[in-house]
């Protein structure tokens, strides 16, 4: 029994049932029942068309459940007994499921959980462990998400940008518990790229690959963070970086620039530099200008201030930083870095300590605390 085949077919089969009129929760139950039957039947009698077999089995189980449950009987009027002629391509069914899981009515956290459950095929326990919450809490979150999208009919294409933002949230969780969420996000984005031809899908995939390429060098053996400038670039995954750059170049050639392509271009410039000193910061500032134009995001402008500090000197970076809200996350850490670059070590040490107090996670807090301690050691008479 090829479990990877079943996992790869599940989103498309689920998408078929939703397209035919099944609500999400009922469709998922039917597909799970069909998968159980496949595990039992296929070893002795493998089907010629695995997806067709699963669709037929799941559809029958859905109809049986609909007929047998009086509370669901009212839905029969809008469910055809036979599948409509001319089924949509598998890619369309998978894509519809992505749109459903990233529906605007869902909170970002619920969209992420539902995407991992329905499209990624992860168990509720795996998702709960990845997000460090009790399994019961995650089960409730997923159940609420299913109820929210039940009955939603996606007769028109959904918003690709919403799906991409959901996948990027998954990617940014990195690795937690027994699930490599970054690798899972890359897998799902690859799957999405085969279903929809959009340069921003390619841009996101390129961005993920370029960031993932640096993963092995991001932490020291003791688990502490290693800043980009100090990373051992020989530990970067050159194959993943090259793939990301190739995907990005093809996307940029279509001349439909979007925010993920711009972010990937910045990551590509870092990947191109053999050493931190060879980084083309002038081009990076130009790409941040494009990204700021596309998003008008204060976080982008914060990162731009860092790049300006590298391209034009720390005082120019501090001038760019002065125009931003000091309450921005990581504003104080950026200010500390720029003050250190400018030679103002007492101010930098104080700001590193302050930034550590407000750090969003333990790894960053420890890193900023070490930076403050390092400078304070130099300042002692």
Where are these regions (language model features)?
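Arg/Lys-rich amphipathic alpha helix in sigma70-family domain 2
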Residues: 45, 55-77
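Amphipathic helix-loop-helix modules that constitute alpha-helical solenoid scaffolds
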Residues: 73-129, 133-287
